[in-house]
């Protein structure tokens, strides 16, 4: 079993494994104007570390909004789990963060593929919220016995981390038997249209920042260098 979802949204669980509140959709206006407030004129410097297009919907600014409003969930939370991490946790009881989905948060260091601890410290949220990062292909755990019995499956079913951001899995699934992916661009269309290329390393230049490109994590440690374009959201 594997799970992928949209990016940036998350849930918080406490030390007993309880979900502290329903996740809030990234379309919520609570983050409006927060990127400018948080970074001021330092966007280019931040981009040189995170490599992610600065957008108010990103996890960074959702957490900043919670911090500013004094949301008590942050005081009792033990782990932050992005949506596919959260669903996998419900199935296995194992809490970790998959790399591709974590990269959408704007809280990773694009070069090291690890949490940006100085940024997390500046944000003012507990560092322990951010758990181990696992790569696609990692077995997260076994399906819980009670769930397996309920649906008639053996309890030896693996729950596996895929490219848990749906675009990461879509790009990885591009047929490549006859094609050199390094010479191809991709266009993945849904709520958003994502136009880009797959690279071995991020592009963290000022030009890339000002042009609105983002460096999201891909399967196999790749980088999806792309632009977010309006997709089917209006129709949806």
Write out the residue ranges for each language-model feature:
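Glycine-rich beta-strand-to-loop/alpha-helix junction loops that act as flexible
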Residues: 1-6, 136-137, 189-192
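Active-site phosphate-binding/coordination module
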Residues: 2-60
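Glycine-rich phosphate-binding loop of actin/hexokinase-like ATP-binding domains
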Residues: 10-36, 77, 81-116, 157-236
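Generic N-terminal helix/loop capping motif
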Residues: 38-41, 136, 150, 174
């Amino acid at each position: 079993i594997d799970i992928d979802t949209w990016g940036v949204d998350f849930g918080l669980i406490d030390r007993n494994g309880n979900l502290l509140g329903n996740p809030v959709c990234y379309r919520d206006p609570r983050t409006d104007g927060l990127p400018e407030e948080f970074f001021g004129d330092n966007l280019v410097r931040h981009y040189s570390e995170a490599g992610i297009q600065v957008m108010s919907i990103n996890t960074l600014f959702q957490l900043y909004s919670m911090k500013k409003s004094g949301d008590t969930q942050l005081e009792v939370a033990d782990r932050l789990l992005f949506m596919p991490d959260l669903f996998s946790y419900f199935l296995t009881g194992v809490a970790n963060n998959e790399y591709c989905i974590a990269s959408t948060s704007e809280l990773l260091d694009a070069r090291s593929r690890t949490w940006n601890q100085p940024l997390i410290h500046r944000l003012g949220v507990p560092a322990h919220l951010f758990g181990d990062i696992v790569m696609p292909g990692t077995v997260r755990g076994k399906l819980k016995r009670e769930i397996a019995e309920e649906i008639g499956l053996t309890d030896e079913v693996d729950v596996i981390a895929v490219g848990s951001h749906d675009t990461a899995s879509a790009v990885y699934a591009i047929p490549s038997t006859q094609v050199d992916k390094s010479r191809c661009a991709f266009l993945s269309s849904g709520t958003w249209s994502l136009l880009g290329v797959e690279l071995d390393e991020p592009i963290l230049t000022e030009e890339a920042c000002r042009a609105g490109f983002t460096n999201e994590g891909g399967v196999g440690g790749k980088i999806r260098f792309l632009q977010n374009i309006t997709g089917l959201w209006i129709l949806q």
